[in-house]
């Protein structure tokens, strides 16, 4: 009918009414489709700022459902990761190069966290805060080792990043990673006009302190004793006891372990532990000699030099009877 200009009465009144109704419904459908597409786009955009895993933990499926003050307590592994001396490293770069360089680095780190079952809670400048659920994973396997698995993956990714990017920029990045497992509070924090989904608690604070201690001990990854004991036997064989410390802002002392991927350290672990036993048994002179004998296995190791120096000093100046070998850290 429409193509035949000679045709008349192609659309009588009843057909015009039907056509008008169908047109209105089609217009509404198109409008709803565009609205749905926009909502989906907004949801995808928001998910880049607030992880979907965070929403699921709070029992919410949409960002619009979040309300101020919602919170839940949950056992998780908290990770803090930071580039060592980043400010000094990027002084030679212009601002745009700084941002591009940092985004490139983060693009290497984030996949390792996601692959291990974690999610990035926030980016803190050149730092990363990530969370790993400590609940049993599917198939009955433990999820407690996910943070450690991610940390080792990040070390491998860092080597690839340095080979592909840092060499061209004249930089070789090093990172520090702190891991701690325990109870945390996840919730919405802020005021009436500004909300932030975040995680708080002593577990978070200790993980942050451990990341800072990686500089003191000269190792890339540190974890607490409770975190170390929750690892699989294979991963525990990749840990080394380093110290008993009382970190700033924390009353109770914690055990500090290194997580490593070097075969030379793995082969020398028994000798390291024997030297530690001598040290904590107050046989300081013998401990000093035992630590010194490990120089070849732990070449340039900061913790080894520290324990050797401490053992020799205590051999000359024996401590009080209540000495228990706890180091107190005054700085964060």
Predicted regions, residues:
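Alpha-helical scaffold within the catalytic cores of cyclic-nucleotide enzymes
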Residues: 103-118, 134-177, 202-215, 236-237
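Regulatory loop-to-helix N-cap segments in sensory/regulatory domains
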Residues: 3-22, 139, 197
């Amino acid at each position: 009918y429409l193509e035949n200009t000679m045709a008349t009465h192609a659309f009588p009144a009843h057909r015009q009414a039907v056509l008008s109704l169908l047109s209105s419904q089609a217009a509404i459908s198109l409008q709803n489709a565009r609205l749905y597409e926009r909502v989906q786009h907004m949801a995808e955009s928001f998910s880049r700022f607030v992880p979907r895993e965070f929403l699921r933990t709070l029992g919410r499926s949409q960002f619009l459902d979040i309300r101020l003050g919602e919170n839940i307590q949950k056992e998780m592994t908290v990770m803090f990761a930071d580039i060592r001396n980043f400010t000094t490293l990027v002084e030679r770069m212009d601002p745009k190069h700084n941002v591009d360089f940092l985004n490139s680095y983060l693009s290497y780190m984030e996949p390792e966290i996601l692959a291990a079952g974690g999610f990035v809670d926030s980016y803190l400048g050149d730092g990363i805060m990530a969370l790993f659920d400590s609940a049993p994973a599917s198939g009955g396997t433990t999820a407690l080792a996910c943070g450690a698995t991610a940390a080792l993956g990040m070390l491998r990714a860092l080597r690839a990043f340095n080979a592909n990017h840092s060499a061209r920029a004249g930089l070789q990045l090093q990172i520090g990673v702190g891991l701690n497992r325990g109870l945390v509070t996840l919730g919405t924090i802020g005021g009436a006009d500004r909300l932030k989904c975040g995680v708080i608690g002593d577990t978070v604070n200790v993980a942050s302190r451990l990341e800072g201690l990686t500089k003191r001990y000269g190792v890339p990854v540190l974890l607490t004793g409770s975190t170390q004991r929750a690892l699989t036997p294979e991963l525990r064989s990749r840990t080394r006891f380093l110290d008993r410390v009382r970190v700033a802002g924390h009353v109770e002392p914690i055990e500090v372990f290194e997580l490593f991927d070097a075969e030379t350290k793995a082969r020398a672990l028994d000798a390291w532990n024997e030297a530690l036993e001598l040290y904590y048994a107050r046989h300081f002179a013998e401990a000093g000699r035992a630590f010194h004998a490990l120089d070849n296995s732990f070449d340039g190791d900061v913790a080894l030099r520290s324990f050797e120096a401490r053992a020799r000093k205590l051999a000359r100046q024996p401590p009080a009877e209540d000495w228990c070998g706890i180091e107190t850290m005054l700085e964060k």
